[in-house]
Amino acid sequence: MKVLLRNVEEIVTRAELEEALASGTQLRAYAGFEPSGSVHIGHLPIITELKELQQLGFHIIVLLADVHAYLNEKGDFERIRETAEYNRRCFAAAGLSEETEYILGSSFQLDAEYMLDLLQLATVTTEKRARRSMDELSRSKTDRKVSQMLYPLMQ
């Protein structure tokens, strides 16, 4: 439990976590990355946490958010997918096991059901809330593209 609580800001709820741990079922941990460039030292804290969870028996899922990278103008899909594969190889070299599950965002984010969910979310998200998220993501504060408005909804 100590490893799970280290560097954690909030647990909803601790009792549910303890129950899940006691259940004997394999728990899952998830992290998402936009494959938009080189893997760097900033990735290591998350990779280290994932490795520790993996050693505790968690099933690790890594989202390689290729659609996010495309919306954020990081290249065409071919280049982004090459970068995603590079990211996967780097994460494996950093110690994530072969059992790690890697998922490309495009494997589900282009489906009709996901798109309907995204559109429904757009109907209840205020422009102010979306802009707050966009400001954290976008380097260009002026003349942003509509695609950058979708990005926060997909977070």
Regions found by a protein language model. Name each.
Residues 1-155:
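NTP-dependent nucleotidyl-transfer catalytic core
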